[in-house]
């Protein structure tokens, strides 16, 4: 291998790396583990013997963010974010992708990039180049780009034979979009969230976000809601005469359709009734054609998935990406509906002959001759979404199978004949008024044979002769009301986004998903997008202050500018600077006029001062704070006008009127119901503003069960994480031993009587203690073998396991034979004694301290805890 060229190849996902390596090595490769797997084999590269390493990233290597100094909501004015620098940091630091790429690139003379062939993929190309130390200008270490639309052997081999250079302009277009979306979105979101947090009781204000794409998307939903809400129905009347012909009773359609004047409609009804017979004025037959579909692009796939299959856009894209990485369909992100001239339809059809559902149909297409698809739009990116190899439901799974089935049927429809049918129209005259009836008869099913949902509805008509007269059976005067449109469906919303240039084929699903996750809309039956009170109020607020903020025009303009960057027709930095300047001015005006939006919020939501019940005392003013139970649950001090967020999905009660030694706030006890639910005390102030540095770094407080969202108030720190030495509820005084499952500490649940238990302060592990004991407490003594806290149990005299009816016992839950036999571990591994020491990897031994009784600085960094 010493004399071989070394070639590094990087794909976007591990599964694609495996497919590429399998094809190019003909299955003769070795695989070793790394941050992502590395497949190695020998082969030829550009006429020379080479040793290949094929590995992958897992999406974007880097994400954009603000430097640390701009992360503090309390000290940074959102206005400053427009001028703030941005940094790129590893998207997934724990995966160590940068280090992995750097290591694998050592000694390699060439690198071939197999990232997805869209703008995002092009951007990742340059992230990989940066991580590996390759340089586009270095002639000794060459970088190539493989362009492919599927992970089939044919496409991979073709891409390998036609390597190109990465497109920096497309990568810069993504950089521009990321910077614009970050600065605009975060500035508006921080200001809105900070302004409205703590003002209203029934407002879910954890994050009130704004997004240049997200907000216009919401705007479409609210616009339809407003149309429905302001719609005023009108009565109308229509004539409906009935005739009988050859045993068929037919209702005739009035040429005037309907009238909004009852008196006029009544006059026409009288004329028709007096006419008595209908005279056939004309009988016409016309050959009609329903054209086969063009190729399937992403937007149309998402629309069909929502309207016909019941999948949301996000789910549909996940399924499509999975089918793509497994090699069943071509790349699912494309704007094109036109196939390239080089597309091999015959091979693609042959791959489907074996399918038990439509294999026979495919065989007939090949035997009789298939039709070339009708011309569509060539966006210059990827071919339409196409099946690449045969699959069965067992191979791909239920939901993925339904999506795959549609992709196959759509493709087969594009190469099938058109649907042909004869449309018959009969015009009749009654009392001087013209009516008609129509019928349809299919002569050639064409593509509708494989796409039955697109079939023409057949309607049989009896035969009519021009000039014949037919008796009128009756004439109804139908009364109806005009109806408002329904709520937007996901499919209709996708169409509007595409029409107005909101998002791309790669991001439309994300924007729709976001407005649902933010509780701005709810997806109801029929995949209808119904805006919530919060979503409606937000859009109405933008409309009052600056309608541009929720209209699609600005985002459409931004997308156009970004496209110019991608084509090399505009400078990346100039576009970013121009757009940021526009939004900076709009932000300043928005801040000045925020009272207009607040007035709408006040009309819709209840002020905190008028809500909730008194629960615990504020440590600052010593007045009672009100408990707001609406999501997100919180305490509100009307005197200090401060809000303190509480854990969710549980109950909160006052805890024996005890106070925190750090800030004098009254403690509350949080409990999760159920036999395996947890309880822990917390100080409202400490929970929102942890007083010890590094609490979130050490314990991942943002991941603590039921911790509040990351806002300017900080992450959640209950007493079970607090190391304060003098607080009787802290982990130092209530912690017993290390958790057997994680790096946490098992803490005595203070209100678990009579079903006593220890709860891990980080994970879901629970240790059940002897049930029915009168009292269980921790002591200041430690186990000499494992340094865990000694607990004291006062057993019930009727059920005591102690000899001679004794009830009081002290011991270590890990080392005491009696206690070890009485405890049970839930959601974790059992304690195992090894050399006299209990099992567990928790930080700190026993109650979180090191051996000995050193005093602990309450301002410590937690690094030594």
From Swiss-Prot:
It comes from Arabidopsis thaliana (Mouse-ear cress). One of its GO terms (biological process) is DNA topological change. The keyword Magnesium applies. SMART domains: TOP1Ac, TOP1Bc, TOPRIM. Keywords: DNA-binding, Isomerase, Magnesium, Metal-binding, Topoisomerase. It holds the Pfam family Topoisom_bac. Residues 209-214 are annotated as: Interaction with DNA. Mg(2+) 1 binds at residues 12, 116. PROSITE patterns: TOPO_IA_1, TOPO_IA_2, TOPRIM. It catalyses: ATP-independent breakage of single-stranded DNA, followed by passage and rejoining. Residues 854-865 have a biased composition (Basic and acidic residues). The record marks 73, 190, 197, 333 as: Interaction with DNA. Binds two Mg(2+) per subunit. Residues 6-151 form the Toprim domain. Gene3D superfamilies: 3.40.50.140, Topoisomerase I, domain 2 (1.10.460.10), Topoisomerase I, domain 3 (2.70.20.10), Topoisomerase I, domain 4 (1.10.290.10). GO terms for molecular function: DNA binding; DNA topoisomerase type I (single strand cut, ATP-independent) activity; metal ion binding; mRNA binding. Residues 833-853 have a biased composition (Basic residues). Residues 167-587 form the Topo IA-type catalytic domain. Residues 833-865 are annotated as: Disordered. Its cofactor is Mg(2+). This is DNA topoisomerase 3-beta. Mg(2+) 2 binds at residues 116, 118. The active site is at residue 331. Releases the supercoiling and torsional tension of DNA introduced during the DNA replication and transcription by transiently cleaving and rejoining one strand of the DNA duplex. Introduces a single-strand break via transesterification at a target site in duplex DNA. The scissile phosphodiester is attacked by the catalytic tyrosine of the enzyme, resulting in the formation of a DNA-(5'-phosphotyrosyl)-enzyme intermediate and the expulsion of a 3'-OH DNA strand. The free DNA strand than undergoes passage around the unbroken strand thus removing DNA supercoils. Its EC number is 5.6.2.1. It comes from the Eukaryota. Belongs to the type IA topoisomerase family.
């Amino acid at each position: 291998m010493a004399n071989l060229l070394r070639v590094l190849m990087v794909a976007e996902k591990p599964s694609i790396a495996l497919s590429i390596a399998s094809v190019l090595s003909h299955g003769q490769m070795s695989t070793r583990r790394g941050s992502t797997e590395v497949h190695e084999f020998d082969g030829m590269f550009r006429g020379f013997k080479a040793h290949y390493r094929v590995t992958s990233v897992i999406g974007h290597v880097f994400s954009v963010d603000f430097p640390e100094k701009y992360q503090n909501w309390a000290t940074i004015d959102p206005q400053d974010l427009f001028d703030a620098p941005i940094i790129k940091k590893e998207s997934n630091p724990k995966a160590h992708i940068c280090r992995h790429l750097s290591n694998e690139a050592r000694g390699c003379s060439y690198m071939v990039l197999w990232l997805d062939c869209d703008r995002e993929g092009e951007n990742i190309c340059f992230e990989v180049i940066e991580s590996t130390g390759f340089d586009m200008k270095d002639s000794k270490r060459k970088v190539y780009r493989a362009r492919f639309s599927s992970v089939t052997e044919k496409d991979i081999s073709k891409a390998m034979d036609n390597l190109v250079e990465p497109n920096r302009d497309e990568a810069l277009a993504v950089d521009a979009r990321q910077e614009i979306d970050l600065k605009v979105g975060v500035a508006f979101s921080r200001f809105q969230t900070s302004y409205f947090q703590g003002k209203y009781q029934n407002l879910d204000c954890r994050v009130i976000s704004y997004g240049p794409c997200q907000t216009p998307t919401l705007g479409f939903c609210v616009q339809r809601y407003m149309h429905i809400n302001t719609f005023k129905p009108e009565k109308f009347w229509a004539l409906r005469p009935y005739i009988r012909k050859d045993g068929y009773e037919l209702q005739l359609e009035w040429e005037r359709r309907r009238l909004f004047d009852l008196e006029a409609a009544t006059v026409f009804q009288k004329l028709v009734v007096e006419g008595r017979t209908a005279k056939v004025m004309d009988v016409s037959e016309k050959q009609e054609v329903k054209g086969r579909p063009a190729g399937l692009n992403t937007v149309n796939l998402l629309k069909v998935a929502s309207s016909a299959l019941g999948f949301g856009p996000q789910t549909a894209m996940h399924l499509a990406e999975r089918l793509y990485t497994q090699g069943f369909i071509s790349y699912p992100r494309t704007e094109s509906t036109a196939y390239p001239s080089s597309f091999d339809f015959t091979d693609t059809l042959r791959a489907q002959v074996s399918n038990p559902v439509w294999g026979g149909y495919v065989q007939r297409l090949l035997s009789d001759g298939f039709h070339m698809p009708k011309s569509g739009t060539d966006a210059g990116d990827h071919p339409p979404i196409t099946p690449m190899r045969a699959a069965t439901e067992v191979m791909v799974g239920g939901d993925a199978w339904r999506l795959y089935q549609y992709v196959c049927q759509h493709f087969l429809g594009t190469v099938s004949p058109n649907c042909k049918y004869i449309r018959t129209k009969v015009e009749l005259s009654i009392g001087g008024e013209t009516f008609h009836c129509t019928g349809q008869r299919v002569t050639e099913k064409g593509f509708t044979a494989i796409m039955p949902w697109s079939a023409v509805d057949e309607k049989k008509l009896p035969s009519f002769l021009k000039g014949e007269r037919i008796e009128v059976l009756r004439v109804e005067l139908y009364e109806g009301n005009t109806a408002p449109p329904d709520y937007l469906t996901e499919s209709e919303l996708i169409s509007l986004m595409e029409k107005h240039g909101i998002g791309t084929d790669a991001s439309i699903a994300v924007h729709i998903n976001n407005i649902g996750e933010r509780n701005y809309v709810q997806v109801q039956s029929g995949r209808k997008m119904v805006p919530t009170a919060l979503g409606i109020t937000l859009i109405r607020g933008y409309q009052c202050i600056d309608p541009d903020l929720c209209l699609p025009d600005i985002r459409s303009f931004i997308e156009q500018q970004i496209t110019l960057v991608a084509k090399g027709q505009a400078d990346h930095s100039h576009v970013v600077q121009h757009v940021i300047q526009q939004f900076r001015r709009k932000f300043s005006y928005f801040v000045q006029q925020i009272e207009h939006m607040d007035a709408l919020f006040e009309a819709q939501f209840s002020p905190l001062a008028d809500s909730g019940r008194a629960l615990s005392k504020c440590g600052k003013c010593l007045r009672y704070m009100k408990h707001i139970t609406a999501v997100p649950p919180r305490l509100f001090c009307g005197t200090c006008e401060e809000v303190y967020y509480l854990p969710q999905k549980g109950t909160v009660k006052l805890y024996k009127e005890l106070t925190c030694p750090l800030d004098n706030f009254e403690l509350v006890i949080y409990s999760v119901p159920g036999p395996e639910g947890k309880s822990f005390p917390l100080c409202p102030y400490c929970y929102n503003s942890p007083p010890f540095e590094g609490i979130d770094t050490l314990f991942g407080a943002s991941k603590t069960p039921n911790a509040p969202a990351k806002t300017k108030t900080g992450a959640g720190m209950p007493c079970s994480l607090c190391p304060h030495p003098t607080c009787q509820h802290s982990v130092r005084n209530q912690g017993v031993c290390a958790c057997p499952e994680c790096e946490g500490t098992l803490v005595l649940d203070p209100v678990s009587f009579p079903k006593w238990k220890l709860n891990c302060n980080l994970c879901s592990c629970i240790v059940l203690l002897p049930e029915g004991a009168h009292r269980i407490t921790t002591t200041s003594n430690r186990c000499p073998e494992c340094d865990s806290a000694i607990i004291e149990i006062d057993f019930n005299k009727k059920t005591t396991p102690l000899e001679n009816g004794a009830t009081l016992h002290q011991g270590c839950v890990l080392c005491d034979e009696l206690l070890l036999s009485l405890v049970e571990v839930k959601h974790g591994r059992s304690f195992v004694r090894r050399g006299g020491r209990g099992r567990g990897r928790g930080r700190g031994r026993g109650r979180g301290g090191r051996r000995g009784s050193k005093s602990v600085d309450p301002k410590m960094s937690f690094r030594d805890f």
